[in-house]
Design a protein with these regions (language model features):
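Terminal alpha-helical segments
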Residues: 1-143
Length: 143
């Protein structure tokens, strides 16, 4: 298997992780479960999509903030993705941080629910971009 095919497989894996995270967020939301958990899954859905993009970039980071900054600088500010998606990713990160690390911070449905739709659009747009850039169709990959 070539390096390009391995990159495509990893990108597809990251996009699958993104889709699963958003499915989990939807399940938790409709089930009336913890909004902290919903926000966490929304953020990770978007984060995994960004990791799929970074497979094709000369960049690595051990910090989420670095990944987000790179996405905003190289994908949003360059015009490849709309500013609204950059804002949605930043909002998801902020809510996940607050929900996971602040002891007395409570998320509301009004904060979290709209972000679920934005996250779905985010992942769809990343997939479309990668499909156009490298042709991620699974049937084109060889063993």
């Amino acid at each position: 298997m070539s390096i390009d095919e391995k990159k495509k497989l990893l990108a597809l894996h990251r996009l699958q992780q993104a889709a699963e995270s958003l499915e989990e967020a939807q399940y938790l939301m409709t089930g009336g479960k913890s909004l902290r958990s919903v926000a966490n899954r929304i953020y990770y859905g978007m984060f995994y999509a960004v990791l799929a993009l970074l497979i094709y970039e000369p960049y690595t980071s051990s910090k989420h903030s670095g990944v987000l900054a790179y996405f905003n600088k190289h994908f949003v500010k360059s015009g490849l993705f709309p500013e609204s998606l950059g804002r949605a990713l930043s909002k998801a990160f902020e809510l996940r941080q607050r929900g996971d690390y602040r002891e007395y911070f409570e998320l509301t449905k009004d904060q979290v629910e709209p972000l679920l739709d934005e996250a779905g659009q985010f992942v769809a747009d990343v997939r479309k971009y990668l499909d156009e850039k490298v042709g991620l169709q699974e049937d084109h990959l060889k063993d």
